[in-house]
């Protein structure tokens, strides 16, 4: 049972998501699921898993109902949830876009005493339900709550590495940098691009390279923000200007706001490294290890430290 207290982090979201996936795969279902938050990826994956595994294909015709918040109302949802299943153990009711319901709090009339033969899935995207409401409190007590938080820039690469590993592959650091540089922290978009990439890779490929990314996703391995900050660190002005000129000529593929964000983060890290050097010289502070410095700079891997030393 999910207990909603305190501010949820992306790490909390991933932990809760993985636990729910295991519980559902094992057939241990809750009577009510509240899947809410800004990151739609985890909400969709849990809803899809429940839709595809609780009932057999034959049972779904009679016992699985999918409605959309903008096209239904709370009373209709409650009536569906109170129906008895026909020729099956469960009635599955999935409410998508529940944030569009006019009065979602009215669902508390059902969640106060949910039917043990119904699995109600409430997908509340883009924001979180008010945790002070009776609806939220009921579901925390009687069901499962997944609060889906978007990752920060420095969190996405670790998740991405784990995601690729779960598919039986690894990915080189430069390829990771290219993906996150181009696609940002949009997990749904990144996972879709990787899913397509994995279908195109030669059979037996176990490591995704920068060349694979360029050939199959269309992100240049030579002209991207990852290469721009690397050229700046190496004081290779000609290379940096060449990349900047490429960006100027291809603004659609290289948005200025993304580049500015990458440059800000890069110089912020350089400042932190130089401040640490000053502390070592003037305050006799012990030098941090590579792992400690990597964590301080919020780098996904100590591999990237050479850019800042």
Protein language model features and the residues they cover:
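Non-catalytic interfacial helical region
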Residues: 2-19, 25-34, 38-230, 234, ...
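C-terminal alpha-helical interaction modules of replication/initiation AAA+ assemblies
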Residues: 224-227, 239-309
């Amino acid at each position: 049972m999910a207990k909603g207290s305190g501010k949820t982090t992306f790490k909390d979201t991933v932990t809760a998501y993985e636990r729910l996936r295991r519980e559902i795969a094992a057939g241990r279902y809750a009577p009510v699921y509240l899947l809410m938050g800004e990151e739609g990826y985890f909400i969709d994956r849990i809803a899809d898993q429940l839709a595809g595994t609780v009932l057999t294909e034959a049972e779904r015709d009679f016992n699985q109902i999918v409605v959309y918040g903008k096209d239904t109302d709370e009373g209709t949802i409650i009536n569906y949830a109170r129906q008895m299943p026909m020729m099956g153990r469960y009635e599955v009711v999935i409410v998508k876009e529940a944030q569009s319901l006019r009065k979602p709090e009215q669902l508390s009339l059902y969640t106060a005493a949910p039917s043990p033969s119904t699995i109600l899935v409430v997908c509340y995207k883009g924001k979180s339900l008010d945790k002070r409401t009776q609806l939220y409190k009921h579901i925390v007590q009687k069901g499962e709550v997944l609060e889906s938080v978007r990752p920060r820039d420095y969190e996405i690469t670790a998740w991405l590495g784990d995601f690729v590993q779960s598919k039986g592959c690894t990915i080189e650091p430069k390829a990771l940098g290219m993906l996150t540089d181009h696609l940002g922290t949009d997990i749904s978009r990144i996972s879709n691009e990787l899913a397509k990439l994995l279908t195109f890779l030669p059979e037996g490929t176990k490591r995704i390279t920068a060349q694979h990314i360029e050939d199959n996703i269309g992100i240049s391995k030579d002209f991207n923000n990852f290469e721009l900050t690397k050229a700046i660190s190496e004081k290779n002005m000609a290379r940096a200007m060449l990349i900047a000129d490429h960006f100027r000529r291809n603004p659609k593929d290289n948005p200025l706001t993304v580049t500015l964000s990458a440059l800000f983060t890069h110089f912020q890290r350089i400042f932190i490294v130089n401040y640490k050097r000053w502390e070592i010289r003037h305050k006799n502070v012990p030098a941090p290890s590579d792992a400690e410095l990597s964590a301080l700079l919020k780098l996904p891997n100590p591999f990237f430290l050479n850019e800042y030393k």
